[in-house]
Every structure is written in C-alpha cells, then in structure tokens.
Swiss-Prot record:
Homodimer. This is Triosephosphate isomerase, cytosolic. It comes from Oryza sativa subsp. japonica. The gene is TPI. GO terms for cellular component: cytosol. SUPFAM superfamilies: Triosephosphate isomerase (TIM).
Length: 253
C-alpha cells in the first residue's frame, strides 16, 4: 500500500467570521479528489476550530496549529491536547518554523510536544526545516536530522505522524524550493528514518513539503517520488487550494 497523499492547509493567524465562512464555502463546493487518493486537513486558528469542524464537508478534517507540551493547568494562554481531543479535533501542527523562530521552541521542546500529543490520541504534523543561512552553509540535512532526531528519541510509534519539511527561506517569501531541492531533502529524511528508526517507518511515513506551494507549482512538486503532499500556507485561504488538493492525482496517474 502506497503512502496516501496528504494536503494540509495552515491558515495561520488569519481570518474573520466572514472570511472563514467564505473559505469553508469554497472547500465545501469544490470538486476534490476522493479520500482514496488524498487526505485533506485544514488548520484554522483556535477560535474558529469548532465552527469550521461543524460546517466543513466530512471528507476534510481539521487540525489545531499548536498545543501545550503537557496536561493543562496553570498555563495561561495555552490549549492542551486533552482539550483538542475533547472537541474531537483529530490533528495538530507542531514545531512550525514560526513558533521555533519567534517563540524560541527548541528541538527538544517540540519533541516533547509531539510525544505528549500522540500519547493523548492526537495525530501530528511535525515540522522540520532550515533557514537560508543554514542552507547556504550546506547544513540543511544536519539541521533537519537534528530536528527529526529530537522527535524520534521520544516516540516509538510513527503511525500517526506526518513529517512536514518546510524550508524556512521559502515560507511566505514567494521563494520556493525547486522540485529537485525538495526531493533531495525528502529523500534524505527518508534515508535518515531508515537508518535511525526503521526501514518500515521510512517507507510508510508521509513526508510533505511546505514552502510557498501554489496552484502553479504543486503538480511539478507532487510528481517527485518522495513528496507525499503539502503543508500550504497563504494559498490555503484561496480557491487555488482546491487545485493543490487535486495535484494528488499526479501520483495515481
């Protein structure tokens, strides 16, 4: 059984009730590939999670953009994994580069978050990626391997983990890794998993690409053998997100 294509839409800190209604309408009315071909998850801000979940067509799942590293309590402003489970939110994004860079989340902290979220029954989109400076110094694989290692040291079961490779220099910049650049890192990550976790985990774990994915470049990226889908930012707020979802058909063509 091949790896099912996975498309995540990260709305980040965007949206009003009117805008959310419009995005949900686009998603509900769009012609999208069947769930046999693609798994689709959208991640609105916390405040919109319940309404989006209740209004979206059932084929599209929802994810939180973050959760706390342990059980809830006196952690003002945080949302716990248990709360998400209570709301029947199946997925969470963890380790996004914006949280790593702006909020100082370390590899170890992200690894702890992933382990705790999984322990509570959530599925995790775990983000890794390098900065422009790190890429230019030739340390891309060292960086993403260290980020992945911090996760692998803390979990035993990878069944509910999707790894999102997001080159930081290509997020929101309009720059995009070439399909060959994306494939190179995805292949490197898969080889790392094979060597450090298991061949089975390497073969079955989906590694998706996140970095200025658009309707214009998605098919070329999707055609690469180790690109198992996308984590989409700005384009997930627009009608072209439907085209990105449907790029999954490239795999089954």
């Amino acid at each position: 059984m091949g790896r099912k294509f996975f498309v995540g839409g990260n709305w980040k800190c965007n949206g009003t009730t009117d805008q959310v209604d419009k995005i949900v309408k686009i998603l509900n009315e769009g012609q999208i590939a069947s769930t046999d071909v693609v798994e689709v998850v959208v991640s609105p801000p916390y405040v919109f999670l319940p309404v989006v979940k209740s209004q979206l067509r059932p084929e599209i799942q929802v994810a939180a953009q973050n959760c706390w590293v342990k059980k809830g309590g006196a952690f003002t402003g945080e949302v716990s994994a248990e709360m998400l489970v209570n709301l029947s939110i199946p997925w969470v994004i963890l380790g996004h580069s914006e949280r790593r860079s702006l909020l100082g989340e370390s590899n170890e902290f992200v690894g702890d978050k992933v382990a705790y979220a999984l322990s509570q029954g959530l599925k995790v989109i775990a983000c890794v990626g390098e900065t422009l400076e790190q890429r230019e110094s030739g340390s891309t694989m060292d960086v993403v391997a260290a980020q992945t290692k911090a996760i692998s040291e803390r979990i035993k079961d990878w069944t509910n983990v999707v790894v999102a490779y997001e080159p930081v220099w290509a997020i929101g910049t309009g720059k995009v890794a070439t399909p060959d650049q994306a494939q190179e890192v995805h292949d490197g990550l898969r080889k790392w998993l094979a060597a450090n976790v298991s061949a089975e985990v390497a073969e079955s774990t989906r590694i998706i690409y996140g970095g200025s994915v658009t309707g214009a470049n998605c098919k070329e990226l999707a055609a690469k053998p180790d690109v198992d889908g996308f984590l989409v930012g700005g384009a997930s707020l627009k009608p072209e997100f439907i085209d990105i979802i449907n790029s999954a058909t490239v795999k089954s063509a």
